Amino acid sequence: MARSIKKGPFIDAHLLKKVDAARASNDKRPIKTWSRRSTVLPDFVGLTIAVHNGRQHIPVYVSENMVGHKLGEFALTRTFKGHAASKKAKR
């Protein structure tokens, strides 16, 4: 179920504060955040946000196509190494 339009998009206050400061100072360094649940706003376009994936911060360059999605969608938390090969297929 999607979030109500009446409520508006969710964004952590501390992340919004960091984004506003980066916009004001025209700073190009990545903004570190642990807030995977925050929605990407149009103000974020052109910035690099380092999103935590549980182990490290993954730099995500925000483009216009990402607006409306959550930051966590762009920093994967699981690494798929592939299924184990069957012994029958090896012969």
From Swiss-Prot:
SUPFAM superfamilies: Ribosomal protein S19
Keywords for this protein: Ribonucleoprotein, Ribosomal protein, RNA-binding, rRNA-binding
Superkingdom: Bacteria
GO biological process, one term: translation
Keyword set includes Ribosomal protein: yes
GO molecular function, one term: structural constituent of ribosome
Assigned protein family: Belongs to the universal ribosomal protein uS19 family.
Protein name per its UniProtKB record: Small ribosomal subunit protein uS19
Organism this protein belongs to: Azoarcus sp. (strain BH72)
